[in-house]
Amino acid sequence: ERTKYAYIGRSDQQKGLPQPPLELPHDLSRPVIELPRDGLQGTPSLDLRDAILQRRSIRSFVREPLSLAELAWLLFATQGVQHVEGRHWTMRTVPSAGARHAFETYLMIHNVEGLEPGLYRYLALSHRIEQLDTDPTLAHAIAAACFDQQFILRCNAVFLWTAVPYRMTWRYGERGYRDLHLD
């Protein structure tokens, strides 16, 4: 009720406060891996109707590693940047209220060609990944946070999304929390 327009004061954008960054800053002391930009050029098209009708959750994973090109394509498909408008907004492969794109993508890598197992962060603006941690116990902590679902330890990569709420609330005030949950 309190986030209805009638109750909302001026947003930080309306107050003239600076916009939050489009992406969390990269720690220059951490290793960064360039991702292939061509993605899966040979991947056949799939009709949307067929994709919806054929969709199944399968938790039986093959042991062959995910290629770096496959990982790059999945990252681009889920948070990829298609266009940057100055420092103001990005056009991505996914929608976001007001092009605010509050989500940050993290990866728990288990079995990807050329990558050491560990925690990474997707740097969407430059289509790279930043290595954050290679502690082998981290995967078990993430599985525990996912209600001890053991497939979290057996899959090639786990996508983890966090949000920077201020990217939304800067523009929309308290109502930004609603938009964040819709995104």
Which functions belong to the PLM regions below?
Residues E174-D183:
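Short pre-catalytic strand/loop immediately N-terminal to key active-site residues, enriched for Gly-Thr
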Residues R167-R171:
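Short acidic/His/Gly/Ser-rich catalytic and metal-binding motifs that mark active-site loops
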